[in-house]
Amino acid sequence: MGLSDCLIYRLVVRCFLDYSICAPFYFYHKFMLSASEPVF
């Protein structure tokens, strides 16, 4: 397992964990904003 593979694996795991934690808050925030103004 090369160094690049290890970094990619850690990046994927970190992104997955961050997404699973932050996604509900992100979508809730986006939903609340969409009620008053468009979100890009």
Swiss-Prot record:
Keywords: Auxin signaling pathway, Cytoplasm, Membrane, Nucleus, Transmembrane, Transmembrane helix
Broad class of where this protein is predominantly found: cytoplasm
Induction (UniProt): Up-regulated by auxin.
UniProt membrane topology term: Single-pass membrane protein
Tissue distribution of the protein: Expressed in cotyledons, hypocotyls, roots, newly developing leaves and shoot apical meristem. Not detected in flowers, siliques or mature leaves.
GO CC annotation terms, alphabetical: cytoplasm; membrane; nucleus
Subcellular compartments: Cytoplasm; Nucleus; Membrane
Tagged with keyword Nucleus: yes
Spans through the membrane: 7-29
UniProt-listed GO biological process terms: auxin-activated signaling pathway; negative regulation of auxin mediated signaling pathway; root development
UniProt function note: Negative regulator of the auxin response.
More details: Knock-down mutants have no visible phenotype in the absence of exogenous auxin, but are more sensitive to auxin-induced inhibition of root elongation and initiation of lateral roots.
Protein name: Auxin-responsive endogenous peptide 1
Organism in which the protein naturally occurs: Arabidopsis thaliana
